[in-house]
């Protein structure tokens, strides 16, 4: 059950990304349609679980106890591993995780068996062909899906443009006919190929009459889509929702083995042992029965379908994974979830060079004509949507078509890889990756692809060790590992909720970017700015105190932790400035001229606060790391007193900003002036000590730096409060 929930939470992105990203219907409607597809796909599946029964290991050489050890290790690993990816919001392949977990667990037991046997070798116990085909699927899927996604979307955009409603008088019928025919073909070839009613005769008939079926469907659906268009029905929405249903159907029918194949193989093994193992011990009963195919009872399939639909509708982590994929494909610039990497920057530079080269040889008339087809200011995108219905349609139709063709041609294409890479290819063709966002989007894509390889490595390694522990630890180890898995899942859920609570401020930014009312935009921008600057003051307060305390107590770990926080906060500041600038662009000129300067000054002072903490922490860390002499008692006493006052000032300023209450702010101004006076006095005292040579020069240098940065913190905090008051002031 847990594996079904975490598995569906991750794989839901495959069939929900396009319809959710384009807002083809309300989220509940999309879930309802996908839920029907998932349930029908699961219920009609004939439950062939061959890969979990004998796809990786050779069961005729394994005893009942060994098989149960492998399968239990796989289940424990799979639940935890997929939950980690769901928490991170990273789409991965449940097929990859299951295959490599089976491989890791089997390899562990195979090593033990080979060591204890003179007749068996690893080749007799493990089937590595499946693992190699999965690795090959990553490379093949990435290349094929990305290229064709880019090509087909470019052609679709040239035909329809971003203002597609003006250019679909007759072309929409042909497009709809091709799209729906492709979806039907995909459902027959991939979605229903293993269904209980799909007999060998039915498959052969479809294969013999494929051309006739495709031709008939194309003619019928072309006429139907054209008629629907004349009746004012949005054909693109029909295509997107039908494509969502088809992918959900195929997912449930084909990927069900990833979730229930392993436990059902264990159940089948247990039934076989209890039925035929009389007089045999678990260590002496060979599992030859797993060589045969097993038909799963209908009630298991029905129950799996119900659980999958429940997980689809209730899992918050599924929404998190979908958000990652949608954000990477978003048409407009906005808050980017990924940073910049050297390889991404290199790829962007190479692409720009290539693009400039093509541009030089292309006729000017052709360039001007193409530019008219890609005018993004004419885009028809629903409120809150990431991209339009044309791209969503291409995503679903092309993904389904590629998967169906791959199945027919015996190419090892993965549903997860194809759907994700098609979406990335279409977004690139739509010029969604501009110069200001391309490096972040490419980093995100590379991170997801890297995660696929990490899934394989982590699944193999973790399951290998878990199987070893279970084999040698017995019942006690099983209980301990189950307890550890439960603890990990609970801890993951708690941490996820905390992280989501911290990200709640992003809701304000989302509302801001979706609003078109200037007054509302300004109010939301003020609220968003308060939320972000309060976080900066909270960071400054916490890490100023942490750095000083750690330095005075020679706590190297505390200083390293503070330095790590500074590096992370610098990235957040960059992101805050970028998203803030995008938000400012949505205000009218008069408001920008009146309030813009204060906004940008506030961001600059916030940035200076973070850099001041970094300049404070770095010499302190170096001093303690080199085991130099600590501050003397007088210096510690002086700076401890002033530190308490600075931390208190930061707390008061944070509360005032949080409550948007700037009354009696003059009290804080006077307090800040007093603190700067105290710090200047400490600086003069230390300079006097240097002149009399009464202390260590290294100690004096770091102490003077601490005083200077403490003054900077006080000054920048007050300046931040001043400009924040002016920005928040309503006239």
Report each predicted region and the residues it spans.
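Multi-pass alpha-helical transmembrane bundle typical of ion/small-solute transporters
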Residues: 1-519, 680
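Cytosolic, long alpha-helical scaffolding segments
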Residues: 494-731
């Amino acid at each position: 059950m847990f594996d079904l929930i975490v598995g569906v939470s991750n794989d839901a992105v495959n069939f929900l990304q396009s319809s959710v990203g384009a807002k083809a219907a309300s989220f509940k409607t999309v879930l309802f349609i996908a839920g029907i597809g998932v349930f029908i796909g699961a219920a009609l599946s004939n439950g062939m679980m061959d890969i979990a029964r004998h796809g990786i290991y050779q069961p005729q050489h394994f005893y009942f106890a060994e098989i149960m050890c492998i399968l239990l290790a796989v289940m424990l690993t799979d639940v935890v591993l997929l939950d980690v990816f769901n928490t991170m919001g990273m789409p991965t392949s449940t097929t990859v995780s299951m295959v490599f977990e089976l491989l890791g667990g089997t390899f562990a037991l195979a090593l033990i068996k080979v060591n204890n046997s003179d007749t068996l070798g690893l080749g007799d116990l493990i089937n590595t062909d499946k693992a190699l085909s999965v690795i090959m699927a990553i490379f093949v899927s990435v290349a094929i899906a990305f290229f064709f996604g880019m090509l087909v979307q470019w052609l679709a955009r040239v035909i329809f443009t971003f203002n597609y409603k003006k250019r679909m008088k007759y072309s929409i019928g042909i497009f709809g006919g091709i799209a729906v025919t492709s979806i039907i073909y995909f459902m027959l070839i991939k979605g229903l190929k293993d269904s209980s009613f799909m007999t060998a005769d039915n498959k052969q008939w479809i294969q013999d009459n494929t051309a006739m079926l495709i031709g008939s469907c194309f003619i019928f659906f072309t006429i139907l889509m054209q008629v629907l268009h004349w009746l004012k029905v949005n054909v693109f929405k029909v295509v997107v929702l039908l494509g969502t249903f088809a992918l959900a159907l195929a997912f449930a029918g084909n990927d069900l083995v990833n979730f229930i194949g392993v436990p059902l193989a264990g159940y089948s093994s247990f039934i076989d042992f209890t039925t035929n193992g009389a007089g045999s011990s678990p260590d002496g009963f060979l599992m030859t029965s797993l060589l045969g195919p097993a038909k799963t009872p209908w009630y298991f399939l029905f129950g799996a379908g119900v659980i999958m639909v429940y997980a689809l509708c209730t899992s918050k982590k599924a929404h998190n994974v979908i958000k990652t994929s949608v954000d990477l494909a978003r048409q407009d610039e906005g808050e980017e979830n990924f940073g910049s990497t050297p390889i991404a920057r290199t790829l962007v530079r190479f692409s720009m060079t290539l693009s400039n080269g093509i541009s030089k040889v292309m006729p000017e008339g052709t360039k001007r004509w193409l530019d008219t087809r890609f005018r993004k200011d004419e885009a028809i995108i629903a409120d809150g949507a990431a991209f339009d219905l044309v791209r969503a349609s291409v995503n679903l139709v092309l993904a389904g078509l590629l998967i169906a063709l791959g199945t027919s041609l015996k190419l090892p294409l993965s549903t997860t890889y194809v759907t994700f890479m098609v979406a990335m290819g279409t977004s690139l063709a739509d010029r969604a990756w501009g110069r200001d966002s391309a490096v972040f989007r490419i980093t995100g894509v590379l991170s997801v692809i890297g995660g696929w390889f990490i899934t394989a490595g982590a699944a193999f390694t973790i399951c290998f060790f878990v199987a070893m522990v279970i084999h040698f630890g017995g019942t006690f180890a099983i209980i301990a590992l189950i307890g550890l898995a439960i603890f990990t899942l609970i801890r993951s859920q708690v941490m996820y909720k905390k992280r989501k609570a911290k990200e709640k401020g992003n809701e304000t930014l989302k509302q801001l970017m979706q609003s078109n009312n200037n007054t509302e935009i300004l109010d939301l921008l003020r609220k968003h700015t308060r939320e972000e600057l309060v976080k900066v003051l909270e960071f400054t307060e916490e890490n100023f105190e942490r750095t000083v305390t750690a330095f005075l107590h020679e706590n190297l770990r505390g200083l390293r932790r503070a330095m790590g926080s500074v590096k992370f906060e610098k990235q957040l500041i960059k992101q805050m400035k970028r998203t803030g600038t995008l938000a400012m662009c949505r205000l009218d000129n008069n408001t920008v001229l009146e309030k813009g300067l204060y906004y940008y000054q506030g961001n600059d002072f916030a940035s200076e606060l973070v850099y001041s903490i970094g300049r404070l922490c770095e010499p302190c860390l170096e001093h303690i790391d080199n085991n130099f002499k600590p501050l003397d008692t007088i210096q510690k006493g002086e700076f401890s007193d002033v530190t308490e006052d600075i931390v208190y000032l930061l707390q008061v300023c944070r509360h005032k900003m949080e409550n948007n209450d700037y009354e009696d702010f003059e009290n804080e101004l006077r307090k800040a002036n007093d603190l700067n006076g105290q710090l200047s006095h400490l600086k003069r005292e230390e300079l006097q000590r240097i002149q009399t040579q009464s202390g260590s020069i290294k100690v004096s240098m770091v102490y003077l730096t601490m005083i200077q940065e403490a003054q900077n913190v006080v000054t920048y905090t007050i300046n931040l409060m001043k400009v924040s008051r002016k920005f928040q002031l309503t006239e």
